[in-house]
Regions:
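Catalytic core of non-heme Fe(II) oxygenases with the double-stranded beta-helix
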Residues: 112-190, 224
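Non-heme Fe(II)/2-oxoglutarate
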Residues: 14-98, 119
Length: 247
């Protein structure tokens, strides 16, 4: 629980505000060698090939729906994957997980390339538990399109819909009534967040710049050994495929 500030009326403290049930989005900066960075960008452009966007008009090119979702199996990206996986482990510990009681798996890893005026619509990742994005471009200005994280609930607006604005009584972007949080990309910036959170990417507003990032989806299961708790999926090594009954 975070105590934000006390309320005052005529100079007398009347109450204390408690921010409850926080949602944690973590950020950190990774150091990427400039030569490695240039090589990664060249590789990702080659993987994109002649396709400059997804089938939906105005949408950025995303590797997960274009057959490029296993960057974690490419040797070139192994150092980056290792660094991001370390940070993902740190995220779990930061929000109270006992790492000895869970196993963390990297499920998907794909690039997102956004040319001018391309965006990624609001979505979440229902097949993952923890997601991360590592930016390979950006100067922190947000001109190339910010990552927007959408609030799952708006309890403090009290009257449903008021926080949307349109001349309503709630102050715009008040910290206790915000419906979104924006993060501007910059080289080496890593962001981690619960996969269930809705998020989007605003349009790239710089006609001279390519916005490039790598996305990671992690899944949490029980450890390989021992009895798994009923609320946590057993380790994949304990799974068995069912026979194909379609033929």
């Amino acid at each position: 629980m975070l105590v934000l500030w006390a309320g005052f009326f005529n100079g007398v403290m009347t109450f204390t505000l408690h921010q409850l049930f926080p949602t944690v989005v973590a950020t950190t900066k990774l150091v990427i060698d400039p030569l490695d960075l240039a090589g990664h960008l060249q590789t990702l452009l080659a993987l994109r090939g002649g396709t400059v966007g997804n089938p939906s008009e105005g949408c950025a090119w995303t590797g997960d729906i274009n057959g490029v979702w296993q960057l974690h199996h490419q040797a070139e990206f192994a150092p980056l994957v290792h660094k991001v996986s370390e940070q993902a482990t740190g995220y779990l510990e930061s929000v109270g997980f006992d790492r000895s009681q869970v196993a963390l798996h990297l499920q998907r890893c794909w690039p997102v390339l956004s040319d001018w005026d391309q965006l990624v619509g609001r979505h979440h990742h229902p097949n993952a538990h923890l997601s991360a994005v590592l930016y390979l471009t950006g100067d922190g200005s947000g001109e190339e399109g910010v990552l927007r994280v959408h609030a799952p609930h708006q309890s403090n607006e009290l009257v449903p819909g008021l926080v949307a604005g349109h001349g309503g009584p709630i102050s715009s972007d008040h910290p206790l009534n915000s419906e979104r949080w924006d993060l501007a990309p910059e080289v080496g910036l890593l962001v981690l967040f619960p996969s269930r959170l809705d998020h989007s990417v605003l349009a790239n507003g710089d006609p001279e710049s390519l916005r490039c990032s790598i996305s990671f989806d992690f899944v949490i299961t029980a450890p390989e050994h021992g009895n798994p708790p009923e609320y946590l999926a057993p380790h994949p090594s304990q799974w068995s495929p069912c026979p194909d009954l379609s033929s």
